[in-house]
Amino acid sequence: MQKIIAFFMSIIAFFMNLFGLTPKTPGVTEYKDLAYGSVSESQKLDLYLPEREDKNVGLIVYIHGGAWQSGDKKELTETAKGITRDFGYATASLNYRMLGEKATYVEMLDDIQSALSFIRQKAEENGYKIKCCGLIGYSAGAHLSLLYAFKNVGSYPIPVSYVSSLAGPTDLTDPNFYKNEAIAPLLGSLAGVSGVTAENYEGYAQELLKASPVSYVSADVPKTILCHGTADDIVPYSNAQILSEKMNSAGAFCKFITFEGANHGVLGEDTASSELYYNTLIEWSKTDFGY
């Protein structure tokens, strides 16, 4: 029970202290603002390695949200350090090129690939071997986590054993997205096309689907936790339903956790669902990482 509480408090810190900074955490070796690319200042990550005798470790990677145009890795600082301290897992939180730099989903996925390669190398330089990793993302970060994991099966620098999506977009052609007219140009920019509106988005379906995790579902994708609120007015609940159904049909494993009445924030609004989510993360991490 104590570890469940610790895991809960570590992740909930994201929502309570978005910009909290604290001194070095005992038992954690911290590496801040490591450049994993040379194209943009955005290509930086923070890495936390556990100070433990057994250097064979699991890794949890956090990808921040912010509508692909805002947000920062430091939002996950306390969450990442808490997991490394309490569970002995390596953790990383990364920034990536966003829409303001004219990046599309292609560049964003390239950044995740580069970041994982860099993390593996940095860990090895310090005597660690990363067994596998879990990807955890919220909103836009959840979309990128899913899209990366599904699209790149067979080419991970570090094996991806699971993905956790908190309110993540999964199908950019879902009509329910376009009830909010402001979302259309944003999704178009993400997919690399201009002129997308709530009235004409169907004409861009091919491009939008290329940027949608639902397009890359197969029996080989990592097991996935989908968490979504039924009252989400930014990313429609139907997006999670669509992906869950597609994964089930393909023979992929999907744990779909519904947060009744929750909006886009998801966690903390449904205690029973939150507990189920945290327990699932703990179980999967222990099983996949071996401790």
What are these regions (language model features)?
Residues 1-4:
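Positively charged n-region of N-terminal signal peptides that target proteins for export
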Residues 6-10:
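Sec-dependent N-terminal signal peptides
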Residues 12-291:
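Alpha/beta-hydrolase superfamily serine-hydrolase fold, recognizing
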